[in-house]
Regions:
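Rossmann-fold scaffold of SDR-type NAD(P)-dependent oxidoreductases
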Residues: 11, 88-98, 120, 155-158, ...
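N-terminal Rossmann NAD(P)H-binding glycine-rich loop of SDR-like oxidoreductase domains
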Residues: 14, 18-23
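Conserved glycine-rich Rossmann-like NAD(P)H-binding loop of the short-chain dehydrogenase/reductase
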Residues: 26-47
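Rossmann-fold cofactor-recognition segment
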Residues: 53-72
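Conserved Rossmann-fold cofactor-binding substructure of NAD(P)-dependent oxidoreductases
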Residues: 69-88
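Conserved mid-core alpha-helix of short-chain dehydrogenase/reductase
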Residues: 73-76, 123-130
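Catalytic loop of short-chain dehydrogenase/reductase
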Residues: 99, 104-122, 132-198
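C-terminal helical subdomain
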Residues: 199, 206-209, 214, 218-257
């Protein structure tokens, strides 16, 4: 591996933040050797921009199908990624894929909750479990002391809406109960992982990208995807063991749980 370059996997890369992460990463925002870009249907029309990036950077980008709501798909992806990265392991896993439901409590069904949890919490949980061996391989083979994304890290994209302390400030304009509850659970999952795998020197952190103008965020967002992603990349690059278990916004401000 070239000095300073890392092996990265990003989920949900066919559009929005995930696609912008791939675009900026291959442009050098984070030095990368292998970039595994995952999405549910990489051959479909919604992934044309991703396919174009893959064709432009065939030595760096590997596009791998992944449905994070399907454990079999996650296991198959882990096998393929293991073959791609080999003995170097995986330095950075970005749990970006997610779905949204804007319903208030009285309009939220049990099925709504199950659907959001299956993708937004069980997906990241299974990604951590199945890719842990590759993350451990990267951590164990690294000569870097302490924690960083250049060693081994999992960064999950969360949301201010998952903050319990901020509900009264944000609920009136955006109830989204199933989404809020799933992101709150993701925050707890990440904090547990940060504690459990501290001994392995694998960094776990949560980032809120801001209200971004994407398909999910809508046109009324306050920030464009390139700016959000670049600032998140800058944060990722500066992370150390003191950020293990942290919950930050894209500007580096700590978000209350």
């Amino acid at each position: 591996m070239e000095a300073g370059s890392i092996n990265v996997l990003i989920t949900g890369t066919n559009r929005g933040l995930g696609l912008e992460m791939v675009r900026l990463m291959v442009e050098g925002s984070i030095p990368v050797k292998k970039l595994i870009a995952c999405c549910r249907d990489p051959d479909g029309p919604r992934a044309e921009a991703l396919q174009t990036l893959g064709e432009q950077h065939p030595d760096i980008i590997s596009i791998v199908p992944l449905d994070i709501s399907d454990i079999c798909s996650i296991k198959e992806c882990a096998q393929r990624v293991g073959a791609l990265v080999g003995s170097e392991g995986l330095n950075l896993l970005v749990n970006n894929a997610g779905i949204i439901n804007r319903s208030p409590l009285l309009e939220s069904s049990c099925e709504d909750m199950r659907t959001l949890f299956n993708t937004n919490i069980l997906g990241p949980m299974n990604m951590i479990k199945e890719f842990l061996p590759l993350l451990r391989t990267a951590a164990e083979s690294s000569k870097i002391s302490g924690m960083s994304i250049r060693k081994a890290a999992v960064v999950s994209i969360s949301s201010l809406l998952g903050s319990v302390q901020n509900v009264t400030k944000t609920y009136e304009n955006f109830s989204a109960v199933p989404y809020r509850v799933s992101k709150c659970a993701l925050n707890m999952l990440t904090t547990c992982a940060a504690t459990e795998f501290r001994k392995d020197e694998i960094l776990f952190s949560l980032l809120h990208p801001g209200w971004v103008r994407t398909d999910m965020g809508g046109n009324n967002g306050l920030i464009d995807a390139p700016e959000s992603v670049q600032k998140m990349f800058d944060l990722m690059a500066s992370m150390t063991e003191k950020h293990n278990g942290s919950f930050l916004d894209y500007q580096g401000q700590t978000i209350a749980w």
